[in-house]
Regions:
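Long, non-coiled-coil amphipathic alpha-helical linker/lever segments
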Residues: 1-42, 101-115, 196-203
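Short polybasic/polar patches that bind polyanions
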Residues: 26, 97, 259
Length: 266
């Protein structure tokens, strides 16, 4: 029940973050920038298209999260080893219905922990894609690129030793927190192989990984939403970087024309 209530908060965070990303994509649908593969200039695209890719990724994780939230909506009152030896299945059915849960199809003294591990993977995926977006912002904020910057408050300080610097500290923070959520998801996987019909080795770990992961993902989504809303986009630098090597980014068009004339790719 706590997972279901916490899940509603995460869904709200996801919806708000996706909406902010859609507004950013719409604003920069015609903002020309260079696309990169392997970190190297590839072909021209728009910054709006880049953000649309992020939106698609996060919307997919939203759908995955809803599915995982539904999968873990199970309960059981089936006795010490799941045989209903001292309590009829009707009690389980009535209780679960009142709580908005589905009775587990088969259970022991507890619900199998693969349910919980699957759910934790959905949180880890959300954290990981947020890290993906944050990493891109960090790369684009590098001095020699400087296509975007995190918003910088009037009273905010840069480096304590080098005050000219504006470090992407918020995005760096998100990358670090993502590692913690992923580590928690590994713990959830390790909770699956319990002894026989149950032991409590999973219990102590779950008391940490579930509340911590929910709080971390909630924090990460809210922080990333703030980054998106306050993102400074340097359109002139995007255009400058796009034209940095002249027309070399059109090499594929030239290649295709040469192939049409009978030349080989080699």
């Amino acid at each position: 029940l706590q997972i279901q209530d916490s899940g509603k908060i995460i869904l709200k965070d996801l919806d708000e973050t996706i909406q902010s990303m859609k507004e950013l994509a719409q604003k920069h649908k015609d903002t020309v920038c260079i696309g990169r593969s392997h970190g190297i200039h590839a072909e021209i695209m728009t910054f709006g298209v880049k953000i649309c890719n992020w939106i698609d990724i996060l919307e997919r994780q939203r759908a995955n999260f809803i599915h995982a939230l539904d999968e873990i909506r199970v309960g059981q009152i089936s006795g010490p080893v799941g045989t209903y030896s001292n309590i009829p299945p009707e009690v389980e059915a009535i209780t679960c219905k009142k709580l908005g849960l589905m009775p587990a199809r088969v259970s022991t003294q507890i619900i199998a922990r693969d349910y919980h591990a699957y759910f934790m993977q959905s949180l880890a995926l959300i954290a990981s894609v947020i890290e993906q977006f944050a990493t891109e912002i960090r790369h684009l904020q590098r001095t020699e690129v400087l296509e975007v910057e995190e918003g910088f408050g009037k009273k905010q300080k840069g480096s304590s030793a080098m005050p000219h610097k504006k470090n992407p500290v918020l995005s760096e923070n998100l990358c670090g927190l993502s590692r913690v959520v992923r580590a928690n998801s590994i713990v959830a996987l390790e909770n699956i192989p319990l002894w026989h019909e149950r032991d409590i080795s999973h219990s102590s770990a779950e008391r940490i990984i579930f509340p911590d992961s929910f709080m971390l993902v909630d924090f990460m989504l809210n922080r990333f939403n703030g980054i998106v809303k306050n993102l400074v986009v340097h359109e002139k630098n995007m255009l400058k970087n796009t034209n940095k090597f002249g027309g070399i980014v059109y090499s594929q068009r030239v290649l295709l024309k040469l192939i049409e004339k009978g030349l080989t790719r080699e």
